[in-house]
């Protein structure tokens, strides 16, 4: 997999999402449930806005001094007996990981949930050299055995599937014979995955945050699969985006608290794991060898720009859980492993506008995402900045550019504007029915197909205002 998950045009992806009734119902239900639990978790913590401000300051400070903290992290990982590799591109990261796996003659790799490994298409790179990669996060495992179906949500990757679909997938791929009861499905998956953990040669994880002062990585999960992936195989490879770093354990404490409350509405997830280097003498478990792969893949190009705040993201999906656009079209409509508002901001930055120029427009600009973000990323403002860049680079449709140019000329000329307010209502009059325009002409058709368009007022505002002024003069 890579950042881009579909070659279908944006309009086709959206149309498919709108027609998926189950997905829309599932997303709506999940958004309401997560909104309620997040609100309760915020109240329990108290002073939520102050915590948000503190989290924002931590992320901003860290990114402004990221060269220092990455150097400190690297030194401390190596002091603890680990190995560090800085990968400028996805290809470099995959090549390094393949070399490690090949050197161990590994036939099987177990992997915990990691967005950055999906971003760089790590699974495919390992499969190309004959290594079997097993996803151990339950949602990712379901998607993997279902013909590598892409995730539709950052935290709940299989949100778009119902229990009947999961039962059928387990039945077809793994010989499952029981019902669609969620508990039975989960127990079956656990039985399957335990075998994989015990026979794996290498464990690969992501990294929620790396701690620069100690050279540690942290893993935040609810299933415990990341602990097994790091405790049982002899070699552990952690892959992180270069921005996923904190200076000290004190900052980690704050950001993990914000992450858990914002993602799933819990004080903490079931498992918060800190790992420092390989196993030491006397340790009961843990890897004999530890590698940390720090991935750039376009992130350094965002540093120092007006979009730097996008790198503050802690992957909680709070913005996704309140987005009205995501609610209606689902995650696959974005065509990226990063869906929702943060995906609409981040994807064009990492992959360019060529295939993703529509994403900044997949927003109502209601700013619910900005209000929900625990690290105060001004998401709706960044979307507007994207739109400005797209317009400046002349990437908009030719018809749209001509329409905006025509409107600009008309709106900046009092004479043309005044004439337009008389002519346009006259031209639209034949399409008016019961005080509205149910089927607009030309470009308006796309609007009236899905929205209500009131008929133009019979009396222009400027005429109404002049009349009231005259009435006032006579009083």
UniProtKB/Swiss-Prot annotation:
InterPro entries: 4Fe4S_Fe-S-bd, 4Fe4S_Fe_S_CS, FTHF_cligase-like_sf, Helical_ferredxn, LUD_dom, LutB, LutB/LldF, LutB_C. One of its GO terms (molecular function) is metal ion binding. Residues 304-334, 353-382 form the 4Fe-4S ferredoxin-type domain. [4Fe-4S] cluster 1 binds at residues 313, 316, 319, 373. [4Fe-4S] cluster 2 binds at residues 323, 366, 369. GO terms for biological process: lactate metabolic process. The keyword Iron-sulfur applies. PROSITE patterns: 4FE4S_FER_1 (PS00198). Keywords: 4Fe-4S, Electron transport, Iron, Iron-sulfur, Metal-binding, Repeat, Transport. The keyword Repeat applies. Is involved in L-lactate degradation and allows cells to grow with lactate as the sole carbon source. Has probably a role as an electron transporter during oxidation of L-lactate. Belongs to the LutB/YkgF family. This is Lactate utilization protein B. The lineage of its organism: Bacteria, Bacillati, Bacillota, Bacilli, Bacillales.
């Amino acid at each position: 997999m890579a950042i881009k998950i579909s070659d279908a045009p944006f309009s086709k992806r959206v149309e498919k999402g709108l027609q998926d009734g189950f997905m829309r119902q599932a997303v709506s239900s999940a958004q309401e449930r997560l909104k309620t639990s997040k609100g309760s978790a915020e109240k329990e913590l108290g002073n939520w806005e102050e915590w948000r401000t503190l989290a924002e300051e931590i992320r901003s400070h860290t990114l402004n001094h990221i060269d220092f903290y990455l150097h400190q992290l690297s030194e401390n990982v190596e002091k603890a007996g680990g190995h560090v590799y800085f990968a400028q591109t996805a290809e470099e990261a995959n090549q390094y990981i393949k070399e490690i796996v090949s050197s161990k003659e590994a036939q099987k790799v177990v992997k915990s949930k990691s967005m950055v490994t999906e971003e760089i298409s790590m699974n495919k790179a390992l499969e190309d050299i004959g290594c079997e990669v097993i996803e151990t996060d339950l949602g990712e495992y379901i998607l993997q055995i279902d013909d590598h179906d892409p995730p539709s949500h950052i935290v709940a990757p299989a949100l778009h599937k119902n229990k009947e679909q999961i039962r059928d997938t387990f039945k077809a791929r793994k010989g499952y014979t029981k019902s669609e009861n969620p508990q039975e499905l989960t127990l079956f998956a656990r039985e399957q995955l335990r075998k994989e953990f015990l026979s794996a040669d290498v464990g690969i994880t992501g990294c929620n945050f790396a701690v620069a002062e100690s050279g540690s990585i942290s893993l935040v999960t609810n299933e415990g699969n990341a602990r097994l992936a790091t405790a049982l195989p002899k070699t552990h490879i952690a892959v992180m985006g270069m921005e996923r770093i904190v200076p000290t354990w004190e900052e980690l404490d704050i950001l993990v608290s914000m992450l858990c409350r914002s993602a799933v509405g819990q004080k903490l997830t079931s498992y918060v794991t800190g790992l420092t280097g390989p196993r030491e003498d006397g340790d009961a478990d843990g890897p004999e060898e530890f590698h940390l792969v720090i991935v750039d893949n376009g992130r350094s190009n965002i540093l120092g720009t007006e979009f730097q705040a996008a790198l503050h993201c802690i992957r909680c999906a709070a913005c996704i859980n309140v987005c009205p656009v995501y609610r209606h079209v689902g995650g696959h409509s974005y065509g990226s492993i990063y869906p929702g508002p943060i995906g609409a901001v981040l994807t064009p930055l990492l992959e360019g506008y060529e295939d993703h120029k529509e994403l900044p427009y997949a927003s109502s600009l209601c700013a619910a995402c900005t209000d929900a973000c625990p690290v105060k990323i001004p998401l709706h403002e960044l979307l507007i900045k994207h739109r400005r860049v797209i317009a400046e680079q002349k990437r908009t449709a030719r018809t749209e550019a001509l329409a905006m140019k025509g409107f600009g000329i008309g709106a900046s000329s009092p004479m043309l504007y005044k004439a337009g307010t008389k002519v346009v209502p006259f031209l639209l009059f034949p399409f008016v029915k019961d005080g509205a325009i149910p089927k607009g002409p030309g470009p308006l058709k796309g609007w009236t197909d899905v929205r209500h368009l009131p008929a133009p007022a019979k009396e222009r505002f400027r005429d109404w205002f002049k009349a009231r002024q005259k009435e006032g003069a006579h009083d």
